[in-house]
């Protein structure tokens, strides 16, 4: 006879860390070159003018300017950065 109670094991009790995806700079917001605009899996949003795409599909600004989101129907949704005039 066992003198100690057998301890059960659970197959639960794990959780992965959040990936922190989503839009990091919203429409109309001023960004600097190199700053991340959108973190995404796949190309839900496509790079437009003055926007680059990283190997993990992250969209980032290539120049300083204002973020603009454009829906072009069947072509998809694009993110662009419009340069801000130095006079402002």
From Swiss-Prot:
GO BP: translation
One Pfam entry name: Ribosomal_L27
Molecular functions (GO terms): structural constituent of ribosome
Organism this protein belongs to: Acidobacterium capsulatum (strain ATCC 51196 / DSM 11244 / BCRC 80197 / JCM 7670 / NBRC 15755 / NCIMB 13165 / 161)
Source species taxonomy: Bacteria, Pseudomonadati, Acidobacteriota, Terriglobia, Terriglobales
Record Gene3D superfamilies: 2.40.50.100
Record-given protein name: Large ribosomal subunit protein bL27
UniProt family annotation: Belongs to the bacterial ribosomal protein bL27 family.
GO cellular component term of the entry, any: cytosolic large ribosomal subunit
Protein keywords: Ribonucleoprotein, Ribosomal protein
Gene: rpmA
Entry's transmembrane regions: none
């Amino acid at each position: 006879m066992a003198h100690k109670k057998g301890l059960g094991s659970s197959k639960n009790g794990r959780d992965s860390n959040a990936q922190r995806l989503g839009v990091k700079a919203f429409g109309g917001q001023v960004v600097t070159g190199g700053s991340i605009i959108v973190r995404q899996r796949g190309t839900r949003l496509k790079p437009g003018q003055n926007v680059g795409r990283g190997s993990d599909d992250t969209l980032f600004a290539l120049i300083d300017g204002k973020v603009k989101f454009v829906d072009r129907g069947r072509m998809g949704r694009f993110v662009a950065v419009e340069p801000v005039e130095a006079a402002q």
